[in-house]
Design a protein with these regions (language model features):
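Conserved alpha/beta-hydrolase catalytic His-Asp/Glu region
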Residues: 70-72, 90-143
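Gly/Ala-rich beta-loop-alpha elbow adjacent to hydrolase catalytic centers
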Residues: 37-41, 45
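Catalytic histidine neighborhood in serine/cysteine hydrolases
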Residues: 165, 169-184
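Flexible "cap/lid" loop of the alpha/beta hydrolase fold
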Residues: 50, 56-86
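Conserved alpha/beta-hydrolase "acid-adjacent" motif
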Residues: 158-164
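Active-site loop/oxyanion-hole signature of alpha/beta-hydrolase fold enzymes
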Residues: 1-34
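Short beta-strand immediately N-terminal to the catalytic nucleophile in serine-hydrolase-like folds
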Residues: 35-37, 62
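Short beta-strand/loop motif that positions the catalytic acidic residue
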Residues: 145, 151-153
Length: 184
């Protein structure tokens, strides 16, 4: 969905994690020191870990997104809002991104890359990104894992990640939390 050299649509966090585990397994990986993911990548890292097809010592979620704990119809409205914002960014280009988001820490080249990615992605990929990332299914009950989970969060995004942190504390009490200095 996001790869300029592959026009496949993104499907879901769960499927991407499963395909990543397949890829690693077919190449002979049986043990990884760590998996790392930022934001949506944190969701994928967690799901790769929870499948337990490969022994993983550390799962690092850097501001990782956890499933919403809201009624299904509410999550649809949130996904729709996020999707429409991305579609506006896709149509409006850099000038709209600069107006809609805090872009002080990004160069024109960075912003152009974001626009290029948004324009490359299909509408289906963009919708599925928000729908899946906010609603992926963590196994219930969570089976015991021998992986140390780490949740990193920048000090200035702590409020934004409050629900994710609470979810991780509730579902994965063994998680080690690290507050990073003012970043991201």
């Amino acid at each position: 969905g996001y790869d300029f050299e592959n026009d496949r649509d993104f499907t879901s966090v769960e499927q991407f994690a499963s395909e990543l585990n397949d890829w690693l397994s077919t190449r002979g990986y049986r043990n990884l020191y760590a998996v790392y993911g930022c934001s949506m990548g944190g969701s994928i890292a967690l799901m790769v870990t929870l499948e337990q097809r490969i022994k993983i010592n550390h799962c690092i979620m850097d501001g990782g997104i956890t499933p919403y704990q809201l009624p299904w119809f509410v999550t649809r409205f949130i996904a729709l809002k996020d999707y429409l914002m991305m579609m506006l960014g896709r149509v409006g280009g850099i000038s709209l991104l600069e107006k809609a988001f805090a872009t002080d820490e990004y160069s024109k080249e960075d912003l152009q890359y974001v626009v290029d990615v948004l324009r490359h992605c299909s509408r289906k990929t963009l919708w599925r990104t928000f729908d899946s990332c906010n609603n992926y299914r963590v196994p219930e009950p969570v089976s015991d894992i021998n992986t140390q989970i780490h949740y990193w969060c920048a000090k200035n995004e702590e409020k934004e990640r409050k629900q994710d942190i609470a979810y991780m504390k509730r579902k994965f009490p063994q998680t080690e939390f690290t507050k990073l200095p003012d970043l991201g």
